[in-house]
């Protein structure tokens, strides 16, 4: 498939005046089954350099200047402004493995939210324990959100 760009390009377009963001976004988007997505940045270190303010502008432009009403994020803790990003979300879907390390990470997440008085994030977090059929569950949840 032709490389039409990635998430880094989408972030770049948000900084351009008169960039016709919606049209440029359509050129970046790829589709798997019925799910449109923007390919990730090729170097994960670049992702760590993106400031929270840049993410916020990107999300705002996607919602305001494109056909998309739902944004599904696949993010980790290395993203700047992670908790602010999660606070913008209506729902947080979190797959959790059953091993001890994963359970400890979940416990830390919950404790950090309590410490920071962000229990509201926990209230909108839906967890999936184990990997059995997680892909189908996620697809179903996304379809329900769109309807």
What are these regions (language model features)?
Residues 2-6, 35-39, 56-61, 92-94:
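Generic detector of short, locally flexible boundary/turn motifs and exposed helical patches
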Residues 20-29, 39-73:
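Cytosolic-facing regulatory segments adjacent to core modules
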Residues 57-146:
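Conserved catalytic-core segment of NTP-binding enzymes
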């Amino acid at each position: 498939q032709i490389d039409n760009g990635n998430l880094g390009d989408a972030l770049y377009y948000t900084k351009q005046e008169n960039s016709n963001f919606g049209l440029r976004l359509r050129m970046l988007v790829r589709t798997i089954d019925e799910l449109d997505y923007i390919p990730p940045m090729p170097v994960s270190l670049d992702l760590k350099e993106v400031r929270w303010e840049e993410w916020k502008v990107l999300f705002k432009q996607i919602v305001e200047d494109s056909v998309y009403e739902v944004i599904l994020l696949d993010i980790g803790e290395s993203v700047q402004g992670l908790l602010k990003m999660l606070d913008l979300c209506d729902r947080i879907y979190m797959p959790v493995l059953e091993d001890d390390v994963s359970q400890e990470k979940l416990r830390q997440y919950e404790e950090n939210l309590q410490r920071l008085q962000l229990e509201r994030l926990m209230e909108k977090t839906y967890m999936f324990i184990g990997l059995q059929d997680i892909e189908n569950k996620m697809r179903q949840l996304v379809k329900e959100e769109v309807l």
